[in-house]
Amino acid sequence: MGKVYKKVELVGTSEEGLEAAIQAALARARKTLRHLDWFEVKEIRGTIGEAGVKEYQVVLEVGFRLEET
């Protein structure tokens, strides 16, 4: 039998950079979701402060495998 996946959308943020924003979103997802298998970056944006980039924001679609019943 094939596997079934569910997708959720998350937004990770970081003042450090894009990779840190992705890692923040995935770290939080791991606390409540099991069987995380993949992610896709859907959107990249940020906020601007007086000195330049204030915060990076990455919208992710995360796929996780549903458990068989």
UniProtKB/Swiss-Prot annotation:
Residue positions annotated to bind CoA are: 6, 28, 32-34, 65-67
Which residues of the sequence carry a binding annotation for FMN? Answer: 3-5, 37-38, 45, 57, 65
Out of the domains of life, which is the source?
Answer: Bacteria
A Pfam family annotated for this chain is: Dodecin
Its Gene Ontology molecular function terms?
nucleotide binding
Listed A to Z, the keywords are: FAD, Flavoprotein, FMN, Nucleotide-binding
InterPro entries (alphabetical)? Dodecin, Dodecin-like, Dodecin-like_sf, Dodecin_bact
Q: Which residue positions does UniProt flag as site: May be important for ligand binding specificity and FMN binding? A: 65
Q: Which Gene3D superfamilies did the record assign?
A: Flavin-binding protein dodecin
The outcome of changing residue 65 to A is:
No effect on the orientation of the bound flavin
Question: Which proteins does it associate with, and in what oligomeric form?
Answer: Homododecamer; four homotrimers assemble to form a dodecameric hollow sphere with an outer diameter of about 60 Angstroms. Flavin dimers are bound between subunits with a stoichiometry of 6 flavin dimers per dodecamer. Besides, trimeric coenzyme A molecules can be bound between subunits. A dodecamer can bind simultaneously 12 flavin and 12 coenzyme A molecules.
* Family label: Belongs to the dodecin family.
Q: What does this protein do?
A: May function as storage protein that sequesters various flavins and other cofactors, thereby protecting the cell against undesirable reactions mediated by the free cofactors. Binds and sequesters FMN, FAD, lumiflavin and lumichrome, and can also bind coenzyme A.
> What protein does this entry describe?
Dodecin
Source organism: Thermus thermophilus (strain ATCC 27634 / DSM 579 / HB8)
